[in-house]
Amino acid sequence: MMSTTLFKDFTFEAAHRLPHVPEGHKCGRLHGHSFMVRLEITGEVDPHTGWIIDFAELKAAFKPTYERLDHHYLNDIPGLENPTSEVLAKWIWDQVKPVVPLLSAVMVKETCTAGCIYRGE
């Protein structure tokens, strides 16, 4: 068998503010991002299908989470009252892992140059 990691990227638009930053910090003001989320799946490649998971299945599994995030104010979503990249990555993990057991990492990028990766506890 061959253990492999695959990934699928998603983008969504959302607004947020960080309530616990020092007064005057730019992230304390309402602002938005074009977020990028990468879901990584690690497992054995099925010898019959030649894949770990169908990309369409992964997309369908992420859709309910995507719809909760896209064009929303993240601070209003339960669990995202302090929506840092770190908190958002773990929150996405908690939504997706129950339906995609082979999920091995969630990457969240707020900008082209900044983000984080959550790999579970």
From Swiss-Prot:
Catalyzed reactions: 7,8-dihydroneopterin 3'-triphosphate + H2O = 6-carboxy-5,6,7,8-tetrahydropterin + triphosphate + acetaldehyde + 2 H(+)
Biological or metabolic pathway of the protein: Purine metabolism; 7-cyano-7-deazaguanine biosynthesis
This enzyme's EC code(s): 4.1.2.50
UniProt cross-references to Pfam families, sorted A to Z: PTPS (PF01242)
Enzyme class: lyase
Known cofactor(s): Zn(2+)
Taxonomy, superkingdom: Bacteria
Sites where the protein binds Zn(2+): 16, 31, 33
Active site: residue positions: 27 (proton acceptor), 71 (charge relay system), 110 (charge relay system)
GO BP: queuosine biosynthetic process
Record note on cofactor: Binds 1 zinc ion per subunit.
UniProt entry keywords in alphabetical sequence: Lyase, Metal-binding, Queuosine biosynthesis, Zinc
GO terms assigned for molecular function: 6-carboxytetrahydropterin synthase activity; identical protein binding; zinc ion binding
Function: Catalyzes the conversion of 7,8-dihydroneopterin triphosphate (H2NTP) to 6-carboxy-5,6,7,8-tetrahydropterin (CPH4) and acetaldehyde. Can also convert 6-pyruvoyltetrahydropterin (PPH4) and sepiapterin to CPH4; these 2 compounds are probably intermediates in the reaction from H2NTP.
Sequence similarity: Belongs to the PTPS family. QueD subfamily.
Extra information: The active site is at the interface between 2 subunits. The proton acceptor Cys is on one subunit, and the charge relay system is on the other subunit.
Name of the protein in its database record: 6-carboxy-5,6,7,8-tetrahydropterin synthase
Organism: Escherichia coli (strain K12)
Taxonomic path: Bacteria, Pseudomonadati, Pseudomonadota, Gammaproteobacteria, Enterobacterales
Gene name of the encoded protein: queD
